[in-house]
């Protein structure tokens, strides 16, 4: 006797023969950052399937159920979760947020070896089930872990991307907007280099409507600057530490940043983002490191790097940023 479903629905194409999802996104790690990224991706309708993976089964099941109970209000057809990486099969984009959480006052670089050990398990499993994916690393220290993910995955470097300074630059533009009274979308400024303490503000390129702030204030960003714009960059560097001190972790801003990058990749928008990429040979960098530079993103990952015109002191800061990372990176075991 036919079931209620059988009486209601006449199947034209057997479910086993139907096309797989075309925009499947996997998020590895369902902590605060992972779930902020998940809801940001869902609310922007970027995926036709979302997969969640974590080692903590109860938390994973609870997060999946919570999302599924609200699925009426979303436009993502399928949300799945499992500790087994087979659930991630066929992903176009895999976002890695898993790792040890940064503690109050802890440098991102201090996290490194703990998270390298976690990546030894995660990355091979991702590639096993989604060999054609683009890998977006968010876990900190993101630049070093993007390098580690590249080495462990065997993927071409243009398909291994770190979230890098996309958020740093957003924070920079927000703080500019607060000073100038102009919407942050109209304030243009780039933070490059390490996502962290040695990041580099490109003061020579900061502008509103094409008007360079350095042309109006030649000392901007220097100790001589009477307006102390240098403190804006210090606020960018310190902001994560401040948020962690206040609420214990960062989540919403990085989640929104991940969705911003995911949209550019999945929709092949070819927008320019400051993301972490293999930068040996760029701006006098000689070591095998990943740093944030302005990159063109699309469905293939990073297709181009913009040759940013930097002043000598800015280029020297990028090289110092690279050296900072290399001094930690060369000691890693994986």
UniProtKB/Swiss-Prot annotation:
Pathway(s) annotated for this protein in UniProt: Fermentation; pyruvate fermentation to lactate; (S)-lactate from pyruvate: step 1/1
CDD domains recorded: LDH_1
Subcellular localization(s) per the UniProt record: Cytoplasm
Active-site positions on this chain: 195
Biased segments, Basic and acidic residues type: 8-22
HAMAP family in UniProt: Lactate_dehydrog (MF_00488)
Region of interest (Disordered), ranges: 1-22
Name by which UniProt lists this protein: L-lactate dehydrogenase
Chain positions recorded as NAD(+) binding sites: 31-59, 101, 140
Residues spanning the membrane: none
Record GO terms (molecular function): L-lactate dehydrogenase activity
Reaction equations catalysed: (S)-lactate + NAD(+) = pyruvate + NADH + H(+)
Principal localisation: cytoplasm
Residues annotated to bind substrate: 108, 140, 171, 250
GO CC terms: cytoplasm
EC number(s) per entry: 1.1.1.27
InterPro entries named among the record's database cross-references: L-lactate/malate_DH (IPR001557), L-lactate_DH (IPR011304), L-lactate_DH_AS (IPR018177), Lactate/malate_DH_C (IPR022383), Lactate/malate_DH_N (IPR001236), Lactate_DH/Glyco_Ohase_4_C (IPR015955), NAD(P)-bd_dom_sf (IPR036291)
Keywords: Cytoplasm, NAD, Oxidoreductase
Subunit structure: Homotetramer.
Organism superkingdom: Eukaryota
GO BP annotations, alphabetical order: lactate metabolic process
Family matches, as PROSITE patterns: L_LDH (PS00064)
Enzyme class: oxidoreductase
NAD listed as a keyword: yes
Family: Belongs to the LDH/MDH superfamily. LDH family.
